[in-house]
């Protein structure tokens, strides 16, 4: 996630807030935006193969409505992230916010990770006793995140050079990670 360093209290911008903002910007129901995000891997691969990603094969910069839906969503979310960052202190989780706001000096870019077994245990605790499905769900989620991030940033997801702080929540625990992040923001 990414945090704008400011002395006042931060506003959290989870995925759902960005979905609603993107939906309003491009005129689609938020449920469609969320559903499209869930199926993003296949469409990004398809768009990439067809050479239709934003900025790749367009002779001039297209209007937002002329872009594929996945691109419209990204552009609208990018705009929402930039506008929220201008308004005040905030925390973004995902959506390439670290990359979108990379030129700002008041940004703390954090990547929290854990080993697969620890993540699996946490997922089972969170989502219930669906162990046989959780492992595949985690794999697909990581794959979608990696493809999304790498497509829009041309950088490797999880590469330490993209972050100011990387924390292993499996070794440190969630509470210690929160404490360290709060100290880093000061």
What would you call each of these model-derived segments?
Residues 3-18:
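Short, small-residue-biased leader/transition segments that mark boundaries at the very start
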Residues 78, 174-182:
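Short, amphipathic alpha-helical "lid/cap" segments that border enzyme active or binding sites
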């Amino acid at each position: 996630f990414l945090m704008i360093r400011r002395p006042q209290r931060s506003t959290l911008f989870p995925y759902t807030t960005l979905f609603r903002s993107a939906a309003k910007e491009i005129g689609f129901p938020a449920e469609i935006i969320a559903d499209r995000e869930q199926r993003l891997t296949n469409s990004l691969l398809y768009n990439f193969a067809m050479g239709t990603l934003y900025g790749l094969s367009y002779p001039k910069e297209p209007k937002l409505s002329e872009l594929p839906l996945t691109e419209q969503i990204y552009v609208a979310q990018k705009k929402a992230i930039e506008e929220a960052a201008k308004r005040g202190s905030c925390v973004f989780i995902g959506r390439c916010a670290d990359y979108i706001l990379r030129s700002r000096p008041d940004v703390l870019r954090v990547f929290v990770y854990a080993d697969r077994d620890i993540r699996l245990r946490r997922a089972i605790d969170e989502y219930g006793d669906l162990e046989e499905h959780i492992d595949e769900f985690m794999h697909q989620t990581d794959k979608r995140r990696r493809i999304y991030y790498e497509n829009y940033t041309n950088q490797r997801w999880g590469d330490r050079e993209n972050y100011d702080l990387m924390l292993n929540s499996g070794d440190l625990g969630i509470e210690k990670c929160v404490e360290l992040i709060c100290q880093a923001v000061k």
